[in-house]
Amino acid sequence: MSKPKRERSLPDNEAKAVARMLRVSPQKLNLVAQLIRGRKASAALADLAFSRKRIAVDVKKCLESAIANAENNHDLDVDALVVSEAHVGKGIVMKRFTPRGRGRSGRIFKPFAQLTIVVRQVEEASA
């Protein structure tokens, strides 16, 4: 006997994807996440494709995963998807040391971040 299915935390017209352990500070990742919040999924993909930020490649991969989840797992229309949420969280922080003068050492922090993207299917307003 298997366990009963867990109740879905998102509404039926939403799908999500999570990217963890992204090697960038949450502050820098949030700059790229702000570009796509509230945009149509196709426009957000185009923005990320031409962004000059290094982390935009990973954000684009996560957005493509959210779109694929919406299409394959939840049978949503890809052309009607909008990025409803793109929020950034802190991950772990690796601490490294670098030699300094007079026998001392300095700390270097190497932060990681997490990204959650939620896409929602919107009904087109008939004009």
From Swiss-Prot:
Range of residues in the leader sequence: none
Record has Ribonucleoprotein as a keyword: yes
Keyword tags: Ribonucleoprotein, Ribosomal protein, RNA-binding, rRNA-binding
Top-rank taxon, per record: Bacteria
GO CC terms of this entry: cytosolic large ribosomal subunit
PANTHER family reported in the protein's UniProt record: CHLOROPLAST 50S RIBOSOMAL PROTEIN L22-RELATED, LARGE RIBOSOMAL SUBUNIT PROTEIN UL22M
Primary role: This protein binds specifically to 23S rRNA; its binding is stimulated by other ribosomal proteins, e.g. L4, L17, and L20. It is important during the early stages of 50S assembly. It makes multiple contacts with different domains of the 23S rRNA in the assembled 50S subunit and ribosome.
Name listed for the protein in its UniProt record: Large ribosomal subunit protein uL22
Species of the source: Rhodopseudomonas palustris (strain ATCC BAA-98 / CGA009)
Gene designation: rplV
